[in-house]
């Protein structure tokens, strides 16, 4: 249903944000050609990372090569070729890659309209621990586990959990009526995109109906809670910072 004139579900607050597909405005981003790039979260709003939606035309390309930045990409729709660390993967919906600092990731030969969601941040080294290795994967090959024993909430962990990795990316799936078991308040910052379904997200003292394509930023210690609603399961992809000293 179209939005009412002058109305939006989007909101940018001091410690959280909801950005909906109806609000996207494209930017020009170095390294991305033959595609549009909507920068949905970045430090301009107070975040410690960037989250960008790339929509490719036929012949579009993207190249990520930075000595300090790490890049995670997830194919939301369509298909393309992913090249990373000498390996090439034909990626369809659910394929993903992780390029640590100093590694080159290239995306090429997309079908028209292919969409990739990117999470990018400056890598934080850990003394005595080598940098992480590149990752190519597919969510369909990742086993899920009931979250805290609840079969209505299933968690898939997409990256290794060792100390080399300073952030995690997971997929959370809920059956209709499934929900987080309590309101979370924690140090980890989140970027999130709804993959399927719909529900209600509590962010601090506000409650937001959310659906496929919506993007959420949650600052550290932002109170948060989710319940899946409607007739079908809900899923979201999210990142968080992990494995680093508290000070």
Per-segment meaning from a language model:
Residues 72, 86-101, 204-220:
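Short acidic-glycine-tyrosine-enriched beta hairpin
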Residues 58, 68-85, 187-205:
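Glycine- and acidic-residue-biased ligand/ion/polar-headgroup-sensing regions
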Residues 20-21, 33-39, 50-67, 155-160, ...:
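Conserved short histidine dyad/triad with adjacent acidic residue
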Residues 157-247:
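Structured core of small recognition/catalytic domains
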Residues 1-48, 111-167:
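A short, N-terminal "cap"/entry segment at the start of jelly-roll beta-barrel domains
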Residues 45, 88, 101-126, 211-212, ...:
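Ligand-binding loop in jelly-roll beta-barrel domains
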């Amino acid at each position: 249903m179209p939005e009412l004139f002058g109305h939006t579900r989007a909101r940018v607050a001091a410690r959280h944000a909801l950005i909906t597909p109806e609000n996207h405005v494209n930017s020009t981003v170095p390294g991305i050609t033959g595609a549009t790039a909507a920068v949905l979260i970045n430090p301009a709003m107070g975040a410690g990372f960037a989250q960008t939606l790339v929509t490719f035309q036929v012949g579009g390309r993207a190249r990520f090569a930075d000595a300090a930045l790490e890049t995670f990409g997830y194919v939301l729709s369509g298909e393309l070729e992913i090249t990373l660390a000498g390996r090439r993967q034909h990626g369809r919906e659910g394929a993903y890659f992780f390029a640590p600092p100093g590694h080159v990731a290239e995306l090429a030969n997309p079908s028209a309209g292919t969409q990739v969601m990117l999470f990018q941040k400056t890598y934080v080294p850990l003394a005595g621990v080598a940098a992480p290795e590149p990752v190519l994967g597919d969510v369909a090959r990742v086993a899920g586990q009931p979250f805290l024993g609840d079969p209505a909430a299933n968690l898939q962990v997409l990256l290794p959990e060792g100390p080399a990795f300073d952030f995690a990316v997971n997929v959370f799936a809920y059956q209709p009526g499934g929900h987080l078991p309590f309101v979370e308040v924690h140090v980890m910052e989140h970027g999130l995109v709804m993959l399927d379904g719909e529900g209600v997200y509590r962010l601090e003292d506000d409650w937001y109906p959310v659906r496929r394509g919506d993007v959420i930023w949650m600052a550290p210690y932002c109170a948060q809670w989710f319940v899946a609603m409607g007739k079908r399961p809900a899923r979201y992809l999210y990142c968080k910072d992990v494995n680093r000293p508290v000070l």
